[in-house]
């Protein structure tokens, strides 16, 4: 099973890129962030993407917004989509795929305008993850978490002490989340890559130089071994967003 996440930085500007990409790579589950549109503002091409069960959770006034798409050949009946209690500003959508695995598409606040609100969101997300695992559930968290986990996840020229996205307190919450029973799939499969970036500042050709940050993640439950990651790629060739898609491939045990 292929599960992908992408901060599109405006789906209306990236419509054809999104459609071309999913038809090229055929992910079974797609999580989008920062769609910057309400469902009413989307074209029929997007709302009726025929290969998928589609759920658009758009923010007001073209702000924020996430979506989730489940391939019909993977999930034969329309899954139930919903929002956990910690969802604010249309930042989270969840569903359960075959096998009882809960998938989240998450867009964590950047924190530039209200850093305490970002920490509150991350703490609530941590509590949610802990609750799922306490009930024996399995979870895949996909999205733009707006935190570079360690200094290795930031290009040396972009490392700035005290910069939002690199602060010890936000990193500590992300680390507690992982320690609560998640695995950072990109790092599990590529532990020493110091150029594994998913976001680049949009100036001076920094994407071409791969001078970026790793802000986009696929995190999966590590207990139970129902979810066995076998590949995770940053698709830097896709689209013109300042983020690249990340696609992980899992072998899902049937028991």
What are these regions (language model features)?
Residues 70-72, 95-99, 221-222, 241, ...:
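Active-site beta-strand termini and strand-to-loop segments that position acidic
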Residues 227-236:
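Low-complexity, intrinsically disordered Gly/Pro/Thr-rich segments
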């Amino acid at each position: 099973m292929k599960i992908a996440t992408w901060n599109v930085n405006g789906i209306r500007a990236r419509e054809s890129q999104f459609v071309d990409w999913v038809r090229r790579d055929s992910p079974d589950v797609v999580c989008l962030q920062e769609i910057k549109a309400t469902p009413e503002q989307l074209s029929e091409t997007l709302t009726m993407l025929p290969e998928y069960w589609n759920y658009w959770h758009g923010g007001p006034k073209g702000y924020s917004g996430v979506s989730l798409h489940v391939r019909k050949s993977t999930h034969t009946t329309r899954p139930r989509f919903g929002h956990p209690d910690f969802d604010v500003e249309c930042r989270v959508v969840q569903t359960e795929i075959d096998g009882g695995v809960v998938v989240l598409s998450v867009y964590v606040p950047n924190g530039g305008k209200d850093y305490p609100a970002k920490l509150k969101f991350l703490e609530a997300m941590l509590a949610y993850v802990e609750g799922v695992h306490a009930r024996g559930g399995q979870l895949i968290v996909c999205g733009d978490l707006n935190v570079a986990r360690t200094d290795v996840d930031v290009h040396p020229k972009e490392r700035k002490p005290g910069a939002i996205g690199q602060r010890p307190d936000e990193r500590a919450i992300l680390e507690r989340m992982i320690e609560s029973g998640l695995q950072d799939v990109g790092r599990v499969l590529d532990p020493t890559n110091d150029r594994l970036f998913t976001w680049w500042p949009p100036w001076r050709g920094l994407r071409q130089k791969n001078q970026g940050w790793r802000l986009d993640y696929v995190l999966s439950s590590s207990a139970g071994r129902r979810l066995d990651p076998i590949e995770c790629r940053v698709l830097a060739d896709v689209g013109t967003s300042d983020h690249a898609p990340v696609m992980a491939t899992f072998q899902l045990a049937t028991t």
